[in-house]
Design a protein with these regions (language model features):
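Short, Lys/Arg-rich flexible segments
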Residues: 1-161
Length: 161
């Protein structure tokens, strides 16, 4: 009763609007996730790879594919971290990452020539969010925005404001 009073709707109308929102939820989710492409990419490149040197399963990359001694020397010379695999040398690969959506879901891809080599050597999970970062993205960006969209949809009965 409180919901119908709050929105000034009958229960039947409210239920109808909820069903209609369910129909557009997938589209809204895609739009919301793609709107946060940069935050998702930074969670992977900055937190997972550069700061912690882990893949999407939260496994330290150094444990299964450590840097070659020549790479360690080059990293020391450049003043870059060498105690973990960051996959950053010039930063071009990081900058080339893009979030893509297709029938299989969301995934990161890259236009950089090194992408295939890096995925082959370090595994495709280097471009996967850890559970913790996925949770952070959902709670910080996705959930609040979808909640606002749901409230607007219930009030207006449409996607428009």
């Amino acid at each position: 009763m409180a919901a119908s009073k709050y929105y000034g709707l009958s229960i039947r109308n409210l239920a109808y609007r909820l069903r209609k929102f369910d129909e557009v939820l997938g589209k809204e989710l895609v739009k919301t996730v793609l709107a946060h492409e940069q935050e998702i990419i930074e969670a992977i490149t900055e937190d997972q790879l550069y700061e912690r040197g882990v893949n999407g399963d939260d496994v330290e990359i150094m444990t299964y594919a450590p840097y070659a001694p020549s790479t360690v020397k080059r990293k020391i010379r450049k003043g870059q971290p060498y105690n973990r695999v960051t996959l950053r040398d010039t930063g071009e690969w990081y900058k080339s990452l893009r979030l893509v959506y297709d029938v299989d879901g969301f995934y990161l891809t890259s236009t950089d020539d090194k992408n295939k080599y890096l995925k082959d050597k370090y595994g495709p999970k280097i471009l996967k969010l850890t559970k913790e970062n996925l949770k952070n993205i959902i709670y910080k960006y996705i959930r609040p925005e979808l909640s606002v969209k749901l409230k607007k949809y219930l009030q207006n009965g449409t996607e428009e404001e």
